[in-house]
């Protein structure tokens, strides 16, 4: 099916272009969301008549998205979840959880704007891309930890998945006199 794009769509085309897409993609995504029109004579004439208003609306949306992107750029958000000793989460962090965290901070982001290939299933620092507009993307850092204290330690660069990070290091056990002495064992075998 041929459609006229009403906005820029990644890997498809720019606003105003006539492109050929699969019927299901057009019927289930592009047409219902108002991102495209069927490419026929009446819709082409309608698009040309409304082109200036569509371009103005697109520029307005883009400038709003750029303002949000500037305020989000480089920010880190903490999500606290239960996890095992190895850092594996009991559950996962999905796009919905990221949207809720951003909403708590005052950012209005939709779930479909979060680019998350798979749910996050381990503690640590994760970079997530937000598609705010067809031409505006921003990367944020999601800090998944077991507590706010661990999130601060993780942000400083500490690894929380090793046994030392979980249980702490016993400095007294590392003193040189407590290490294995091979000569002492040889003496006991000779007797």
Swiss-Prot record:
BP GO annotations: translation
An example Gene Ontology molecular-function term: structural constituent of ribosome
Domain of life: Bacteria
Record-level GO cellular component terms: ribonucleoprotein complex; ribosome
Keywords in alphabetical order: Ribonucleoprotein, Ribosomal protein, RNA-binding, rRNA-binding
Pfam families listed in its UniProt record: Ribosomal_L9_C (PF03948), Ribosomal_L9_N (PF01281)
Annotated region described as Disordered, given as residue ranges: 151-191
Role of this protein: Binds to the 23S rRNA.
NCBIfam families assigned: L9
Similarity field: Belongs to the bacterial ribosomal protein bL9 family.
Protein name as catalogued: Large ribosomal subunit protein bL9
Source organism of this protein record: Sinorhizobium medicae (strain WSM419) (Ensifer medicae)
